[in-house]
């Protein structure tokens, strides 16, 4: 499918800017506002995904390495959504051009290297001007500031660990769901998507309790709050109704550096259909 070129017709007005570096986020955000753009800030990938769906901006600028969801996954989900897939995306990152080969789902339309803030901002403006003049089909003129950025071995190592982690999750049971401390879905296995009857892009960012039967929502919410408020690894079992299925689950807290950073739901089976008369 060829990318459409909305920017040739309509100038950029609203922008979602995503970066976990607070100083960069606020500085670039203010500079963009000084050019009369309507700027919405996201501090992590999950927040960026929510803003893109809620606002449907005319352009998105995002870092690659971010908490909760990396920029590559955000890009991939945008391109999977029929209502969002033509959104112009500018990657703004300290990664090198060679590092990007480790992110095959990073389907951005322009790439701007981080660096001295004034120069980086000018390059962002150039990338936006290029996209508005040439459309999404011409990426060559939208690669800016990478002449002196060197690849880093740690990026490849980080990606290997992420893939290994994803493979471990897929091996844990028929379906697995990783949550943040607010109970929102960060990662979900293909098996869990199939069991729940919804796609990954529909589920990422959703509160897991919203997928449960009404009678189980408060119980699961209380369970998650208990697990994520502790400083020790905890595990418990429950049976929860998702749609028409009753599914036995294990819920485990995820600890990092002595604090809970989220929870993992492991579906122990594909469940059984609830008797409507029961």
Short names for language-model regions:
Residues 156-196, 201:
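Sensory modules in modular signal-transduction proteins
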Residues 55-61:
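Active-site beta3 strand of CheY-like receiver
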Residues 123-126, 130-173:
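CheY-like receiver
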Residues 66:
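Receiver (REC) domain active-site loop signature in two-component systems and cognate sites
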Residues 73, 85, 95-127:
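Alpha4 helix (beta4-alpha4-beta5 surface) of REC/receiver domains from two-component response regulators
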Residues 43-47, 58, 70-76:
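Acidic catalytic/metal-coordinating carboxylates
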Residues 21-43, 47:
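Two-component/phosphorelay signaling modules centered on CheY-like receiver
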Residues 212-243:
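Terminal output helix/cap of sensory domains in signal transduction proteins
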């Amino acid at each position: 499918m060829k990318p459409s070129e909305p920017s040739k017709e309509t100038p950029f007005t609203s922008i979602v800017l995503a970066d976990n570096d607070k100083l960069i986020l606020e500085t670039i955000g203010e500079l963009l506002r000084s050019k009369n753009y309507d700027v919405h800030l996201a501090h992590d990938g999950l927040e960026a995904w929510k803003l893109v769906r809620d606002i449907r901006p005319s352009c998105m600028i995002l870092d690659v390495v971010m908490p909760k969801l990396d920029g590559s996954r955000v890009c991939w989900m945008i391109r999977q959504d029929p209502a969002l897939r033509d959104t112009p995306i500018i990657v703004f990152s300290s990664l090198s051009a060679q590092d990007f080969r480790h992110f095959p789902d990073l389907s951005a339309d322009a790439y701007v290297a981080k660096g001295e803030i004034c120069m980086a901002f000018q390059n962002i403006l150039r990338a936006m001007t290029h996209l508005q003049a040439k459309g999404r089909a011409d990426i060559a003129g939208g690669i800016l500031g990478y002449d002196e950025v060197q690849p880093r071995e740690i990026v490849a190592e980080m990606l290997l660990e992420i893939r290994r982690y994803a493979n471990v999750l897929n091996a844990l049971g028929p379906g697995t769901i990783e949550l943040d401390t607010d109970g929102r879905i960060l990662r979900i296995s293909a098996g869990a998507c199939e069991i729940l009857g919804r796609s990954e892009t529909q589920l990422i960012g959703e509160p897991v309790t919203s997928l449960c039967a009404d009678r189980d929502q408060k119980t699961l919410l209380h369970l998650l709050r208990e697990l994520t408020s502790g400083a020790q690894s905890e595990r418990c079992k429950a049976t929860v109704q998702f749609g028409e299925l009753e599914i036995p689950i294990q819920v485990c807290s995820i600890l990092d550096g002595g604090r809970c950073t989220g929870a993992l739901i492991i579906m122990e089976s594909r469940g059984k259909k609830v008797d409507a008369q029961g």
